[in-house]
From Swiss-Prot:
InterPro entries: PE-PGRS_N, PGRS_rpt. Its main location: other. Gene3D superfamilies: HP0062-like domain. This is PE-PGRS family protein PE_PGRS26. Residues 207-221, 229-238, 444-485 have a biased composition (Gly residues). It is found in: Cell surface. One of its GO terms (cellular component) is cell surface.
Amino acid sequence: MSNVMVVPGMLSAAAADVASIGAALSAANGAAAPTTAGVLAAGADEVSAAIASLFSGYARDYQALSAQMARFHQQFVQALTASVGSYAAAEAANASPLQALEQQVLAAINAPTQTLLGRPLIGNGADGLPGQNGGAGGLLWGNGGNGGAGDAAHPNGGNGGDAGMFGNGGAGGAGYSPAAGTGAAGGAGGAGGAGGWLSGNGGAGGNGGTGASGADGGGGLPPVPASPGGNGGGGDAGGAAGMFGTGGAGGTGGDGGAGGAGDSPNSGANGARGGDGGNGAAGGAGGRLFGNGGAGGNGGTAGQGGDGGTALGAGGIGGDGGTGGAGGTGGTAGIGGSSAGAGGAGGDGGAGGTGGGSSMIGGKGGTGGNGGVGGTGGASALTIGNGSSAGAGGAGGAGGTGGTGGYIESLDGKGQAGNGGNGGNGAAGGAGGGGTGAGGNGGAGGNGGDGGPSQGGGNPGFGGDGGTGGPGGVGVPDGIGGANGAQGKHG
């Protein structure tokens, strides 16, 4: 018995095409009718009249036949259009029983393991509520649920659920970013879930939340000091893969909040320090037999220092910039000739705050924050065959710019500028994997971060050191060692 597959949408489009063809033919017949049905005789003789009458008769017969075909065409289009509705109604009627049957069969299959182990045999894990972990996937087949993003009541993101035998791990939830002006720290991201133990990718780690900016200072006796910016939340690690699969990427660290500004114009109070950037997290390990390691997460950018307040007396000192977050370590590779994950880049240091202006003495600018250290590249494992390449080390973060000194109106000069921050050091590259064939290449070292410049009068920051390249793996021949990272530029 042959089977017929019908897609109502395609059938409806075909009916519209057939209707447009009929309309075009009717228009052509109508345009030709006046000139073909009333052919004039070429002369006054009987032969010419007979020929004209013969052709005119043919035209009238054609028009009559065309009218019959037009009626048939209209009936065909109506039948085709009606069949679209019939098929659509049949699909709608059959869909609900089939879905119900599917749910009943799955419920019967999952009932024993759900009762004994609290986990289904087949099916995806549920996504977590805010700040809660995602559910585990089915023991045999199913992806882990994603962790819920953090909120005010549960600032840290939930972890992603683990998969069973086959399936991908759930992604970790992002950390909560509190409201500006509170100076609260950002929530940490959740860890990625593990991939299926036989086959499946690890879930990505959740990103850290952004730290809130600090509150500005206020007047009074004594004046209310400005509050520092909140630190960015740390990212969490990516999930490990199973036997086959790629490790999850590590979460990115959250940015630090800006420091609050000092009070103006009463006290000329100092600005507050910017928050530190959150650390990036490690990438997940690649599959134990074959799979790439996940990349490490980047460190968060630090917050800028608050500006110093202005006053009739001495202006306030600008706040120091925060330190950039460190990059995460790259995930290790599997033994089947895969690549290890690259280390995450260090976060940039925050800029120093501007010194407060004054009619007498300008305030000093804040010191720029130091850049974060790059993450180490992932290592490769011993392989059968050619060795695998290691991950590159992460670059160090750039140092923050030193704050500008405050302006002295009456003495026509400026306050001392802040020093630039130092660049972060680049990380070492991972070691290449050995093998029975050629050894894998070592990972390149990360470049050092550039030192922060000053804004006139202050000392510039020093560039960070480049990371050391990883050694090549042992093999026939041995792998090539990775190149060392470049020294960062001085500010």
